[in-house]
Amino acid sequence: MEEERIYTIPLRDVTNKSPTTKRAPRAIRAIREFLKKHMKSDVVKLDNSINEKVWERSLNKIPAKVRVKVVKEGDVVKATLVE
């Protein structure tokens, strides 16, 4: 059975608590951790569009929040960016 949800993931904490040279990698990690927690799964697959959105304005200027569409199929969670 597929489970589908849309989340707005805040990344402001990553911006405030990270040095400028580590913001984008920590934002990707924060997105994964958020989805692991809320979808109750260990396997999270992120679409390339999420990665491009986070890295769009360089390493240190990440977006404040990201809207993500999440589909859970069995144990695997797949996330794509909401336009």
Swiss-Prot record:
Cysteine disulfide links: none
One GO process term, biological-process aspect: cytoplasmic translation
Cellular-component GO terms for this entry: cytosolic large ribosomal subunit
CDD domains: Ribosomal_L31e
Keyword Ribosomal protein carried by entry: yes
InterPro entries from the UniProt entry: Ribosomal_eL31, Ribosomal_eL31_CS, Ribosomal_eL31_dom_sf
One MF annotation (Gene Ontology) recorded for this entry: structural constituent of ribosome
Keywords: Ribonucleoprotein, Ribosomal protein
PANTHER family, sorted: 60S RIBOSOMAL PROTEIN L31
Family named by the database record: Belongs to the eukaryotic ribosomal protein eL31 family.
Name listed for the protein in its UniProt record: Large ribosomal subunit protein eL31
Gene name of the record: rpl31e
